[in-house]
């Protein structure tokens, strides 16, 4: 009798849990579903009252006009270039810095590591003005360099921390055995340790790709010429001078801009979760 009541209690608990999770998922996904629906609607259908979730006459006009009207292909290309270079820089530089922290010890290592972690609590807006003045004096404003260079100079404290945690979990005997065979520190890093941290590399790659692709603030600050805008900034072209917004075209191009990120995350989701999990458990 007691066993049956326990099973019933567990069943009820699971039903309640799944109900809450499903409801939360619907709430989170509804704006995305509405965006997809709006991108296929005609203008008259978008402003119809009461609003409907399904388009009355599905059309691809918003995609065609949005892509041609705002020269969205140029924005897409700019985002692809910046995201590719910045993502590669993030993965490379953060892994190199983490290798130094994990394998080369000195008296200053703990202090430097605490300073590194402290930068995670520093808002990016604090260093915005000094960085802007630096790039301005170097003649790099209105170029892609301010969006790319920081990724090659450390790659972010959180990414470095993930790599450090995983590097520390690898036995140093691997390094010593490779050095006995004649490998130098760079060869140990590239041929021995990096292949062993692929899950973390993919996790950092996905996070960096999503961040750089969706970044709106930095391109808005550093880019002035419309032909150099990225997708995030280019979406503002669908706002008219009188405040009127071409909602259908904006939703269509927002959906197009999300497609690469969703594809990468769906493809690498397994490795992304594995990398985060292993970095948290090891070290």
Predicted feature residues:
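A structural signal for multi-pass alpha-helical bundles of membrane permease subunits
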Residues: 4-283
